[in-house]
A protein has these predicted regions:
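Positively charged n-region of N-terminal signal peptides that target proteins for export
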Residues: 1-6
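Bacterial N-terminal signal peptides
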Residues: 8-18
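Sec/Tat signal peptide C-region and signal peptidase I cleavage site
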Residues: 19-24
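N-terminal mature ectodomain segment of secretory-pathway/periplasmic proteins
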Residues: 26-117
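Long, terminal "pre-/pro-" and other extracytoplasmic accessory regions
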Residues: 43, 149, 153-158
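Short beta-strand micro-motifs enriched in acidic
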Residues: 69-74, 102, 156, 185, ...
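Gly/Pro-enriched, hydrophobic low-complexity segments
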Residues: 87, 110-114, 120-148, 158-260
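Short, solvent-exposed mixed-charge patches
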Residues: 264-265
Length: 265
């Protein structure tokens, strides 16, 4: 009798533990929405300085310095305005990248690039969003963010401190990858590593976070876990780019009118 009671108790305990484990693991949509917020939508506004260090396969270095400014204008994680203003070197000085972000399914973000050498504003077509950002290994879409509606998401694993999520494009003909795998920190929900795969099943491009800092907003003192150093490696070309984010501040008053096309020049 004792053995039967012990067996029943063990089964009940295992079942209860399994229930707790299931309850503690959020569904994949919750994970990707939280990760998207942490990567792109922390604070109502954000500004800072960015340094890009670009190394080709032979170790030759090029560098870029720019200022960035962001403002959220929609309800929740929706409409967003983003601007990058290049400071150096001379060949890209005064170049401006402007994004009006939307999350409406079927609609693409509006992106513009001001090229001072030609005194021309170029509209970046949807098909060009996965091309190089200022000659670096980062892409335009890396900077402004990829819409969650463009991919199907599957939770592959939830161990070792990460949620591992596979993301497969709904329209594979629009992109150069077959899928990508994101490693999302279980505590902060920051995406810490992204591996992009071709149809061959081999990774060809890797984005990884090298440093995270808690940045306090000047006015409120609220802390925002922020990626301050990240790197992209192109496994096909052997090139890599390190992005360093500094002099960061959140929640400063920023006029929406600054993000108009007429401010590009």
């Amino acid at each position: 009798m004792k053995s039967i009671l012990s067996l029943i108790a063990t089964i009940a305990l295992v079942s209860l533990m399994g229930t707790f484990a299931w309850a503690e693991t959020p569904d994949v949509e919750t994970i990707v929405n939280k990760a998207n917020h942490m990567a792109l939508y922390q604070g109502k506004t954000c500004k800072g300085k960015v340094h890009l260090k670009i190394a080709d396969s032979q170790g030759r270095i090029r560098e870029r310095d720019l200022n960035i400014l962001r403002k959220d204008v929609g309800e929740g994680d929706s409409r967003q305005l983003y601007m990058s203003y290049f400071k150096s070197p001379a060949d890209v000085r005064k170049m401006v990248f402007l994004v009006h972000k939307t999350v409406e399914p079927g609609k693409d973000d509006s992106r513009w690039l001001y090229m001072p050498s030609l005194d021309m504003v170029k509209r970046i077509a949807a098909g060009d969003k996965r091309t190089s950002f200022a000659g670096s290994d980062f892409l335009y879409e890396d900077i402004s963010g990829r819409s969650l509606h463009e991919d199907m998401h599957e939770l592959l694993d939830s161990g070792n401190g990460f949620y591992v999520v596979e993301n497969t494009p709904k329209n594979p003909g629009d992109v150069e990858f077959s899928h990508y795998v994101a490693y999302v920190d279980m505590k902060t929900y920051l995406p810490m590593r992204m591996e992009y795969f071709k149809e061959t099943g081999k990774p060809y491009r890797i984005m990884e976070v090298l440093k995270v800092e808690n940045i306090a907003a000047d006015k409120s003192g609220k802390l925002y876990p922020t990626v301050t150093v990240s790197k992209v490696r192109n496994l096909e070309t052997g090139s890599e780019t390190v992005m360093t984010f500094s002099e960061i501040d959140y929640d400063l008053p920023v006029k929406e009118s600054i993000f108009g096309e007429r401010y590009l020049r």
